[in-house]
Amino acid sequence: RELYNGLYFCQTEDTSMFDLAETIPGPSTETFGALAKELGIVLVLSLFEKRAPGLYHNTAVVLEKDGTIAGKYRKMHIPDDPAYYEKFYFTPGDLGFEPIDTSVGRLGVLVCWDQWYPEAARLMAMRGAEMLIYPTAIGWESSDTQEEKDRQLGAWVTIQRGHAVANGLPVISVNRTGHEPDPSGQTGGIRFWGNSFAAGPQGELLTVFPNDEEEVRVIEIDKTRSENVRRWWPFFRDRRIDAFGGLTERFLV
């Protein structure tokens, strides 16, 4: 999940929260690097990075099976919405959309708000990512109706499954779950909706987690399916890259 080692502090703007930031390498990468080595696994760790005094990022670090740092990604799209005041804390990423090479494949690691932007997923895929991974912190406001909750959750799942389809890649999205109060008391807090999931390269759901409790699961993902799916649905072959120049503009009218 996004910012794994504490509450989602971005519900308020509070300068004391900068004390939570840590360097990379730092305490978390040392602790979880040792765990990755002990278990022989690759870990994706979402952190509040202190790059320098007054300069902070929302960063995902990938730890190799031997405990070393394989690479990191700094969140590019930074929201500033009610209860998600991330621009107060985080500088936009400057590492681009670069997959991270690991012993289990090339990982296209993105973070939360990035998941709403198809361009981010596409650039990761174009640079050879073999799967997309999204540590996430997203949920409902206390005033949301059930209909609004259903719409938001449905949109969140749909767009990420769409990234899987459009790019012929598996997608893994890991979200927070449970209620976290607003420290300022101005709102009823956020009910993080969980529903972490994994989808295959045609958007098929491989597993869906509950919305109200944490679980650990082992899911088998066949990376070779991406090759077959891209042969059937050759979206990369048929892209009209000569006509896409407008995508680098903010708006066209």
Describe the predicted segments one by one.
Residues 11-19, 81-82, 142-143, 147:
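Short glycine/proline- and charge-enriched loop/turn segments
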Residues 45-47, 59-62, 98, 196-198, ...:
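Short beta-strand scaffold segments in enzyme catalytic cores
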Residues 3-24, 53-56:
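Metal-dependent catalytic neighborhoods of phosphoester/phosphodiester hydrolases
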Residues 82-98, 115-117:
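Active-site glycine-rich loop that binds ribose-phosphate moieties when present
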Residues 24-44, 106, 112-216:
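CN hydrolase (nitrilase-like) catalytic-core segments centered on the catalytic cysteine
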Residues 58, 62-70, 197-207:
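Short, glycine-anchored, charge-dense loop/turn motifs used at functional sites
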Residues 75-89, 213-230:
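A short, polar/charged loop-to-alpha-helix boundary motif
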Residues 97-127, 136, 226-253:
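Cysteine/selenocysteine-centered motifs that mediate thiol-based redox chemistry or coordinate metal-sulfur cofactors
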